[in-house]
Amino acid sequence: MKYRIFKMKYTLLFLSVIALVHIFAVEAKDEPESDALVPQERGCLDIGKTCKDDCECCGCGNVCYCPFDWFGGKWQPFGCSCAYGLKYVCAHKQKKCPNV
């Protein structure tokens, strides 16, 4: 008898957790996606986001870093991403980029 009550309690607890997870999943789907900003709509990209130019990265000292930037050009087989730059980057970006 005790085993049956014990089993029933844990079954109800498990079903309650499943129902709670389902409710949060449904609420997440119902939120409008129009409020979400697309990276192109924002003025700049955060650290770690894929970029093509220094001007796309947020902040005065952040740069578009290409770890495998071979031959000095912007040919990057593995892509570039926004990263923290050095102090002189800020002066360079202010000359180059209108949005800094």
Swiss-Prot record:
Q: Provide one Gene Ontology cellular component.
A: extracellular region
For this UniProt record, give its keywords in alphabetical order, as a comma-separated list: Disulfide bond, Knottin, Neurotoxin, Secreted, Signal, Toxin
MF terms in GO: toxin activity
Localisation? Secreted
Which residues are trimmed away as propeptide when the chain matures? 29-41
Tissue and organ distribution: Expressed by the venom gland.
Q: List the disulfide bonds.
A: C44-C58, C51-C64, C57-C82, C66-C80, C90-C97
Signal sequence range: 1-28
Q: Does the keyword Methyltransferase apply?
A: no
Q: Classify the source by domain of life.
A: Eukaryota
Q: Quote the function comment for this protein.
A: Probable neurotoxin.
The record comments on the domains as follows:
The presence of a 'disulfide through disulfide knot' structurally defines this protein as a knottin.
In which family does this protein belong, per the annotation? Answer: Belongs to the neurotoxin 09 (Tx3-6) family.
Q: What is this protein called?
A: U12-ctenitoxin-Pn1a
Instruction: Name the species this protein comes from.
Output: Phoneutria nigriventer (Brazilian armed spider)
